[in-house]
Amino acid sequence: MEFKELDPILHSQLRLAVVSLLISVREAEFTFLKEKTNSTAGNLSVQINKLKDAGYIEVTKQFSNNYPQTICKITTKGIESFEAYVNALQSYMNPGVE
């Protein structure tokens, strides 16, 4: 039995939380993600950039009522990577099942 390697991008608690949220809502504002993850703006910003650089999310910056707004959206690659991560975790919980 060989354990599948876990995706290092998703293995961070905050990045996994962001992707998990985006899986369910598809896209969300930075403030929503910050509130739901209880993270600081600085830490969340760094982790969002790592997810963006990996191609797991798209980030759009715009203005709404003269206020800056950052929208994060899950990509197909992000969805596939999340599903692979979950499958890898399941293989750890059921090592005799393939």
Q: What residue spans do the PLM features occupy?
A:
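Glycine-centered, phosphate/nucleic-acid-interacting loop/turn motifs that mediate DNA/RNA or nucleotide
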Residues: G55
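Residues in the helix-turn-helix
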Residues: N43
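Short beta-strand "wing" residues that participate in macromolecule-binding interfaces
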Residues: V59
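Residues within the DNA-recognition helix of helix-turn-helix
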Residues: Q47
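N-terminal helix-turn-helix DNA-binding core of bacterial DNA-binding proteins
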Residues: E2-T40, Q62-N65, Q69-K73
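Amphipathic alpha-helical dimerization/coiled-coil segments
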Residues: E2-F3, S20, I79-E98
